[in-house]
Amino acid sequence: MNNSQENRNISRRHFLGLAGGAVGMAAVASMGFPSSWAANNPEIDINNIEQQNNETDVLVIGGGMAGLFAAVKAHDAGSSTMLVSKGRLGSSGQTPFAKGIFAYDENNTTFSIDEFVEAISASALGTNNKAYTRQVAEHSLARVNELKEWGFFNSPLYHNSFNKPIEERNITVKERIVITHLIKEKGRIAGAAGFSLDEEKIHFFSAKSVILCTGAGGFKPNGFPICDLTHDGTVMAYNIGAKVTGKEWNDGHPGQVKNAAACFDGWHGMFEKKPEVTNVGIRHDLGVDLNYQAYVAGSPIKRGKPGEGMGNEIEGGPYVPDEFKHRKPTDTRPDSTDGRPPEGRKPSKEGEAPPGMAGELSGGSSAGMAIHKSEGLVPINDKCESNIPGLYAAGDALGSYMVGAIYTQIGSSLAGSAVQGAIAAEAAAEYCKGIKLQTISNSTINRIQEEILAPLKREAGYSPTWVTQTLQGIMIPNFVLYIKRENMLNAALAYIEELRDHHIPMLRAADMHELRLAHETANMILSAEMKLKASIMRKESRCSHYRLDYPEMDNENWQAWINIYKGENGSMQFEKQKFGSWPA
């Protein structure tokens, strides 16, 4: 061993001692350990970055299920259409990992559509938007039948089946382009902008209408395949004045303790499974019940056979309606006693746990994400339209509250994305008929270029990886994100505001990949601020939002959704929207 190698060897005890103060940190840095702050050494010549301009009637952002139907139906309605995706068509966001798609078929269920809507509302404790609940029931079967025609159910991989209707219609698809900005001119949408991951190129898209199919997002946690989802669409829309909602809710999917970061292992063969159709099966799942149990009694938690409890009963915790307590997961109705599995799904094998929930469980696997369809842009009607003229959203990018703020119907997420993509497309195409394509001003183009490339131009700064890890340490603890109380939320908020004010302006990037990470990190920080402030505002517990200091539902004051928007002075503003109403 040479002297250099010998000097870099350090015991754990010595490291912890050194890391305890500024002198220690300086010593650690001198030994060659990576530092959060460093000089930026770009691997590309910024002066050689090109610009490409694109024009279309309807611009669809996102290549998952919602994006597929948005592009196909906008084209079929007569609009020139372009689809742009950060990933690959059919391999973007959570779509490639969803293996159940709901279809309401009156011939295979005892529920009428009215009964289905009311059963969802009972489980969701009023948090669902009945217009969108009814919508998924009314249109899901038609979307499933189209997917059958395209070969969707023939393979565990979705690219080929998604590409079939796209190629048949000659729809332009641009992949591996990170959209960072939505563009508004004269009070309405005018397009979008971003950069290529594979070329040194900035893209500007002029469009009459934009449909966000960008999915939801999280904090790049271990265990759930959402590390390319960072609430990009929500943040871009918020920055141009769109209202967003649903930030206080949580998705409660657990991961596994063993190899917690191994998504493929943790979902026990689901990635290799062909998709299947599910029928009506109302439930009240994947809130923060397990998080509460871990908070009170410790962890890890071991999942038993289907229908078994989680061990000793724990007093208190999230409210579950009586009709959904101690139910087997094969019940078709809340009051079912015959134990028959829902149509379209096989009964679980003896001793088999639900997908991704076998063995010892670990929380936080989907940290930063809410229940599907319960966060995103606020719709002003049942056409997936936002408060920005010409801007629509579908799927997990739309805060439609389709099935509420708790997991109420298996397979509804994929179905809802298909249904909403089609509805948003038809509305966007109709909107395009009455307007002309706007010209994006040179001043806007220059400003956006500067904002996109800023991390590449910094001489020194913070690594987006380090800032993301810091964010995760602040937000993912069970006692911050899931089991909430005001003092902890405020404490976390102080750290997040520090990242917002001091670290975002100093993010650095050396190449196009790290540039993507820098923009994703900034989006996650803003989403974290929204989550904390909305959680502080909702002083009650309901569905997947639980407050230790307000453990009961407050139906007098909180039969309402929380909307968030950017004030005229740039500050984050909040408002209530009564359940069952449209925004004012």
Language-model regions, residue ranges each:
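Glycine- and aromatic-enriched mobile tails/lids
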Residues: 18, 44-49, 54-56, 70, ...
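Conserved N-terminal/central alpha/beta ligand/cofactor-binding core
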Residues: 18-22, 47, 79, 86-201, ...
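Mid-to-C-terminal Rossmann-like scaffold of FAD/NAD(P)H-dependent oxidoreductases
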Residues: 49, 254-347, 356, 361-373, ...
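Core beta-strand elements of the Rossmann-like FAD/NAD(P) dinucleotide-binding domain
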Residues: 54-56, 200-208, 387
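Short, well-ordered coil/turn residues at beta-beta hairpins
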Residues: 62, 213-214, 394-397
